Design a protein with these regions (language model features):
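Glycine/charged-rich beta-loop-alpha catalytic/anionic-binding loops adjacent to active sites
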Residues: 26-35, 108, 239-249
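Hydrophobic anchor at the start of a short beta-strand
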Residues: 7, 57-58, 83, 167, ...
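Conserved beta-alpha-beta core of the PfkB/ribokinase-like small-molecule kinase fold
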Residues: 123, 137-207
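Glycine-rich phosphate/adenosyl-contacting loop at the front of the ribokinase-like
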Residues: 1-61, 69-71, 315-316
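Surface-exposed amphipathic alpha-helices with a cationic face
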Residues: 52, 154-161, 213-216
Length: 316
């Protein structure tokens, strides 16, 4: 029996994610937190969580450090997600999100992360060379802590190509700019990230579509542009599609993009068509927005929303 395709998620800046629900949150006041959630976080770890929920073999890697790093690794073990990380001299960061259901706001305070030393960067590159042989897909998600070279993701993309692995890039800033030049298999930018690549904000949906096409012209096979509540655009050799998410009772947007990416990878592995892959992704992003905690949506919640995703082909 042929083994099921497996995914390696890379999180350079893993975190202890704390999400608090505070009604009527505002500045210069003291609040007592009545409900909250503390979990292992970071964009790649969120991706791994949803892939695991959907039954896809997955492993998480990246940097961890200190007591926070130990908490992250232990939390992953408790969730049944294997991890193989490089340990750093510094302490993994803490990210705090305050959700106010009264005002419909979400305030985030994210630590910058520990200083990564050159030998630690080399250690992760060496680990990735060994791990890549065991996987079919690699995701490069999120930010990098201080000390990580701007071209780190670009190096891994080239490494993956040499190993015959499909690399998905979902990052920002210089990591994204260098990364797209290395030609990943898939890239998933939002509006702000497109602006970082092209030096200007896309002008509406048409502007985002044009930028996605330009990324495709570089040789990237699949480009998915996320537009938040306005939906998402898919551009690939199969064609171009736009999808609109269904209405849900909003709780938190933290992890919705990661849930979307994980569900799209799942759908690709299942051999689904491009529009169905996009539907799965958009449904997962919406399902995540309706739960407390990044990446804790269930298969049932995703499947319930798939028929409610409006998807149309873009005819040139």
């Amino acid at each position: 029996m042929r083994r099921q395709p497996a995914v390696l998620t890379v999180t350079l800046n893993a975190a202890v994610d704390k999400t608090y629900r505070v009604e009527g949150f505002c500045l210069d006041r003291v609040f007592r937190v009545e409900s909250g959630r503390v979990v292992a976080g970071g964009k790649g770890i969120n991706v791994a969580r949803v892939l695991h929920t959907l039954g896809v073999p997955v492993m998480a890697t990246g940097f961890l450090g200190g007591h926070n790093g130990a908490f992250i690794l232990d939390s992953l073990k408790q969730e049944g997600i294997p991890g193989d990380f490089v340990w750093t001299q510094g302490e993994s960061r803490v990210c705090l999100a305050v959700i106010d259901p009264i005002h419909g706001t979400q305030t985030e305070l994210n630590e910058i992360g520990p200083e990564i030393h050159p030998e630690e960067v080399t250690a992760l590159e060496d680990k990735l060379r060994q791990l890549l042989r065991r996987f079919d897909y690699v995701t490069l998600s999120g930010s990098a802590p201080p000390g990580v070279p701007d071209d780190f993701h670009a190096r891994v993309i080239r490494m993956g190509r040499e190993a015959g692995v499909r690399v998905v890039l979902d990052s920002s800033g210089a990591l994204l700019r260098y990364g797209v030049e290395a030609i990943p298999w898939m890239v998933k930018p939002n509006r702000a990230e497109l602006a970082a690549v092209f030096g200007r904000e896309p002008a509406g949906r048409e502007g985002a579509l044009e930028m996605a096409r330009r990324l495709r012209e570089k040789g990237i096979e699949i480009v998915v542009v996320t537009l938040g509540k306005q939906g998402a655009i898919w551009v690939s050799a199969e064609g171009e599609w736009f999808a609109q998410p269904p209405e849900v009772e909003f709780v938190s947007a933290v992890g919705s993009g990661d849930s979307m990416l994980a569900a799209m990878l799942y759908a690709v592995i299942q051999g689904m068509s491009a529009p169905d892959v996009l539907r799965w992704g958009v449904a997962a992003g919406a399902a995540n927005a309706a739960v407390f905690g990044a990446g804790f949506c269930t298969r049932e919640q995703i499947e319930t929303l798939i028929p409610k995703v409006w998807c149309e082909q873009i005819v040139v």
